[in-house]
């Protein structure tokens, strides 16, 4: 028990700065949403359309680079830190290639908008203009992910936390200056929102490089007379391919997840207004909670990667069990809090009786799946440390799209099982998906430990 308590302390020590970094980055979107709420309706609609296209594409790129965390932590654990710089340099090359592809796709966003929906021509033009400005923030965002993943892989999550908090404050100033009507010299509206993203993401990357400049471990230099400085920075296609091969299933998993929730939101959009609002409130609360297990998962992945690289296999089961204990305690606490204080939470958003009644049901489902959600997200982090990323995609795709979504669809929109339930039916589908995913992931971890 003593060794588990020690490991829980170590995991929490890594989790807290990761959580603060994640919450600060998420808060940027929330603050921008509040600021654009005061713009003209066409501007708000244009940004909403733009974000719905930008989010899944940039998260796909983000997922491709997540392979760097377990890669760096394993090398760090093995003691061969002279191999880390070549991984980082090639991760920047991979980020550059991903950026180019994403920027080309986003530049042609007019094709995507025409394909997925019929948008008002004025809103469509404003959306395209917004996306074509926003796309220039892509390299800055992905380069920041490279250095953040490097720091986390080296058990140094604090730089990302510091820059995340500074970036949040900087974002408030820049966004307010460019978006607000009070500054008549700017007042760029939706265009200002795109320019703000460019400035903030590039600022965060440059600031991150600056504050880690004097860290010997992060900026470790290879001293090899047989390798020239030029060769050191040229792309190594084998390393790039290995990072891509490992990151691709993670990226697909993230893409599957976000597109599922996007599709559910689109299907609910045709229902009564109170159902749409209730769904958005419940989704907002659930998405905020999601950052907690994600932070624990990253911490577990880092610790496991380090000891797998060190070949200290006796520590593996302790780390896995300790991360799951943390998940169990926190998820139970959150579920209890939601059940006890659901009314107070909902009334922060609305006072409408119909919305409160439906949101209450959705939050009770949210409380029901917290334990399963924590186990499956932390389990994903554990599997990433084993570099077992293909199975993550298979489990995510199966549980969400083959099990959860059809079940939710039949409950929400058809009379085949019960009389159609509306939006709440999709939430039962999410519950079934998360139960399925957590069982499959825990079974996979059990198999890996046996090996």
From Swiss-Prot:
It comes from the Bacteria. This is Probable multidrug resistance protein NorM. Its main location: membrane. PANTHER family: FMN_FAD EXPORTER YEEO-RELATED, MULTIDRUG RESISTANCE PROTEIN NORM-RELATED. It comes from Buchnera aphidicola subsp. Baizongia pistaciae (strain Bp). It holds the Pfam family MatE. Belongs to the multi antimicrobial extrusion (MATE) (TC 2.A.66.1) family. The lineage of its organism: Bacteria, Pseudomonadati, Pseudomonadota, Gammaproteobacteria, Enterobacterales. The chain crosses the membrane at residues 44-66, 92-109, 130-147, 162-179, 186-208, 247-269, 282-304, 319-341, 391-413, 423-445. Multidrug efflux pump. NCBIfam families: matE. GO terms for cellular component: plasma membrane. Keywords: Antiport, Cell membrane, Ion transport, Membrane, Transmembrane, Transmembrane helix, Transport. It is a multi-pass membrane protein.
